[in-house]
């Protein structure tokens, strides 16, 4: 059969030249099987999706040793995706495709997910862009989700090659208008078919009621108020229609500089301290205007800094922290470690893996973000300080750090609904420019910075270190990162709520028609069946038990901070910067005054951070209280499931965390069955139990990169780099050489 073939020309070590020469072109053989093939292969189109161009007799390579095996089929390009329709797709094992995305298939690439396109001309790899004078014999597509697709066009008709290559380059790289995104085509065509999930209780923060609810939940309504001064975006297009500011702040101050220079509330701690953010005022040269701005900021500052009762610490993220350029440069280097064209290239880079990883600085950037979040947590939790985050537009690093702080301090944010609501509040309503940062329109490459991916990587570090504390899994985080590039959801395709609201109208003469109903990414039923969604929920997570009124009354005298941050009892006197359970207001006031003088002392802050960090990690973890990550060198790891999932050689068959989780689920099922028998004996009502995902029950067949890596598809045979096998000597000598004794010591 021609469904699978082998061709030469692999990268790296060259394979021996085959002696057999075929004089029959593949398209001639396909002519005899054309009717059968057309019945087996079907292009599935979404509502509003249109086919633009296609090419037949395309060979899709898979990553394999020195030879390159592949599958023949059709390569098509629509206004939504690039898709490969293989001739033997029906041969896939159903067990391997249970975690299947209903929107994007295994061989589908959304146009927004394409990162770089390369062509191979006479075994030379070149970047493709613009109009081509010569068309390649091989097409390589690097995706933003780190997949690598290789297509051989050697047996495709010349006209089809020109059409498909030109079409893919144009529709993935040419600048677009916002209204020309597939998002609007889909919403228009599927307007009557979009059904929202009734179980989705994510707070969208698009109403005043949502903000009031959040204030009440965090007990922040004593000092802060929700305002509607920007309703209809009359004051500022950058801000949401509703947000929260300090109660003493007059609403006319919000209008004075179009929302700039205003402390906007993010979250309140149980001890009364709060996390706020502020965008910078416009830069002015005129001394008179500068003086007006200074007096304005002095007045604003007094609303949140009223010593000794309230002390504020400012964190200027624009000048004293990471730059967006650093993040982009680091990620550009980092992602190259995983965009592997073939197995030989993988093993070549394996020798220098650690040096390449270190030189990218990506893990160091993650560490710095987590450390900054811990520092702010220490100020709020231990020193009762308000913290004000400063940034030029308060829409990048402010979103990142404020979200991490809330994840560490608020257990509600570690539930799935709480986490989704957090992203809605801090990122979507916070004005993070997803459209520019993801470069969805391809208008300005310099604006593309993976700030949200950095946030998800930081969250993964917390999930990896403290799995029982989170209701969601790393698989949830991985599919969330993939959803950045699926243009049927509005969540990650606008720069601000104003931009979304002003573009929700239908195009056409009928101006009285209803606005478009855009889907939200939080409706996971659009992408996954219920069975697949079980992998997004952590079976080891246990909700915090609710106390009855009698228990709450008995515990009311204790300070809430003690429940989340156990402190060393042997220390008789409190260290500087740590408030204990003193009730004497005078002592607290004096401590407040002393700390306010030391705000700018970096040594003192570093000492406070180290004591706070060490003290927390020396105690047992309360998964429903304060949660701090380890940030030492070895503790910050590579998010293997996201970055290595498409590399067959990186899999551990029947091993990794998925094997451990499978065993734990077996134990949970056994405990649940015993509990059911006990309940039956006592004739009590059986409580609904969470069913263990059947996908995890046979761990021996699973990969460490489950559920993304498919097993028994590729060879995982190591390939020694050229430099390695040459150093070992002649092949005959290797066969005769006896095994050397290696002392492993205590290993």
Curated annotation (Swiss-Prot):
Positions carrying Phosphoserine: 564, 601, 716
Entry GO MF terms: phosphatidylinositol-3-phosphate phosphatase activity
Pfam families: 3-PAP, Myotub-related
Protein name as annotated: Myotubularin-related protein 12
Chain's role: Acts as an adapter for the myotubularin-related phosphatases. Regulates phosphatase MTM1 protein stability and possibly its intracellular location. By stabilizing MTM1 protein levels, required for skeletal muscle maintenance but not for myogenesis.
Alphabetized UniProt keyword annotations: Cytoplasm, Phosphoprotein, Sarcoplasmic reticulum
Subunit description: Heterodimer with lipid phosphatase MTM1. Heterodimer with lipid phosphatase MTMR2.
One GO BP: phosphatidylinositol dephosphorylation
Localisation: Cytoplasm; Sarcoplasmic reticulum; Cytoplasm, Myofibril, Sarcomere
CDD domains recorded: PTP-MTMR12
């Amino acid at each position: 059969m021609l469904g699978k073939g082998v061709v030469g020309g692999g990268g790296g070590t060259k394979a021996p030249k085959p002696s057999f020469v075929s004089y029959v072109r593949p398209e001639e053989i396909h002519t005899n099987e054309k009717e059968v093939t057309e019945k087996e292969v079907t292009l599935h189109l979404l509502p509003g999706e249109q086919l633009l161009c296609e090419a037949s007799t395309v060979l899709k390579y898979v990553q394999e040793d020195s030879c390159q095996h592949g599958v023949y089929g059709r390569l098509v390009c629509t206004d939504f995706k690039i898709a490969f329709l293989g001739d033997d797709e029906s041969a896939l094992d159903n067990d391997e495709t249970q975690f299947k995305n209903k929107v994007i298939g295994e061989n589908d690439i959304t146009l927004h997910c394409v990162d770089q396109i390369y062509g191979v001309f006479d075994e030379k790899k070149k970047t493709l862009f613009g109009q081509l004078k010569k068309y390649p014999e091989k097409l390589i597509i690097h995706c933003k989700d780190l997949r690598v697709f290789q297509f051989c066009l050697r047996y495709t008709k010349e006209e089809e090659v020109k059409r498909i290559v030109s079409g893919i380059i144009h529709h993935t790289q040419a600048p677009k208008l916002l209204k020309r995104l597939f998002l609007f085509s889909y919403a228009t065509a599927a307007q009557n078919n979009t059904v929202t999930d009734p179980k989705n209780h994510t707070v969208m923060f698009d109403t005043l009621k949502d903000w009031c609810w959040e204030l009440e939940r965090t007990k922040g309504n004593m000092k802060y108020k929700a305002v509607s001064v920007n309703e209809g975006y009359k004051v500022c297009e950058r801000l949401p229609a509703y947000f929260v500011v300090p109660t003493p702040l007059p609403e006319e101050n919000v209008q004075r500089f179009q929302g700039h220079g205003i402390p906007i509330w993010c979250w309140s701690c149980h001890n009364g301290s709060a996390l706020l953010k502020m965008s910078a005022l416009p830069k002015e040269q005129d001394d008179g205007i500068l003086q007006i701005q200074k007096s304005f900021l002095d007045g604003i500052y007094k609303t949140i800094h009223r010593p000794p009762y309230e002390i504020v610490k400012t964190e200027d993220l624009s000048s004293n922290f990471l730059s967006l350029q650093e993040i982009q440069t680091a990620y550009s280097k980092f992602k190259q470690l995983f965009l592997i064209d073939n197995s030989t290239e993988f093993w070549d880079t394996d020798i220098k893996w650690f040096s390449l990883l270190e030189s990218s600085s990506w893990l160091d950037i993650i560490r710095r973000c987590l450390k900054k979040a811990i520092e702010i947590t220490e100020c709020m939790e231990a020193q009762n300080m308000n913290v004000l985050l400063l940034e030029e537009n308060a829409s990048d690093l402010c979103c990142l750090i404020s979200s991490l702080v809330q994840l560490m301090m608020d257990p509600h944010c570690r539930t799935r609904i709480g986490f989704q609501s957090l992203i809605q509040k801090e990122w979507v309503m916070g004005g993070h420019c997803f459209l520019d940062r993801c470069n969805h329109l391809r208008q300005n490459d310099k604006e593309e910075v993976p700030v949200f991916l950095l946030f998800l990587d930081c969250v993964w570090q917390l999930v990896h270190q403290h799995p029982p504390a989170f209701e969601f899994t790393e698989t949830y985080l991985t599919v969330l990162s993939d959803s950045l590039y699926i243009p049927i959801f509005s969540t990650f395709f606008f720069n601000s709520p104003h931009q979304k609201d002003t573009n929700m109208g239908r195009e056409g003469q009928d101006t009285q028609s209803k606005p478009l109903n855009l889907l939200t990414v939080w409706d996971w039923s659009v992408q996954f069946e219920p069975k697949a969604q079980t992998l997004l929920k952590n079976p080891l997570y246990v909700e915090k038990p609710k106390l009855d009124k009698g228990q709450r009354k008995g515990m009311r005298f204790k300070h809430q901070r003690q429940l989340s941050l156990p402190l060393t009892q042997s220390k008789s006197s409190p260290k500087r910067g740590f408030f204990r359970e003193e009730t004497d207001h005078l002592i607290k006031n004096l401590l407040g005054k002393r700390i306010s003088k030391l705000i700018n002392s970096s040594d003192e802050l570093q000492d406070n951070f180290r004591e706070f960090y060490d003290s927390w990690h020396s105690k047992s973890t309360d998964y429903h209280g304060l949660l701090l990550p380890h940030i030492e060198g070895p503790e910050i790891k590579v998010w293997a499931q996201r970055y290595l999932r498409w590399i067959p050689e990186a899999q551990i068959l029947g091993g990794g965390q998925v094997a451990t989780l499978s065993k734990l689920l077996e134990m949970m099922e056994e405990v649940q069955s015993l509990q059911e028998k006990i309940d039956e004996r006592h004739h009590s009502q059986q409580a609904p139990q969470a069913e263990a995902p059947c996908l995890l029950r046979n761990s021996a067949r699973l990969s460490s990169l489950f559920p993304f890596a498919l097993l028994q598809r590729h060879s995982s045979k190591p390939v020694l780099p050229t430099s390695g096998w040459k150093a070992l000597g002649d092949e005959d000598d290797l066969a005769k050489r006896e095994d050397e004794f290696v002392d492993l010591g205590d290993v």
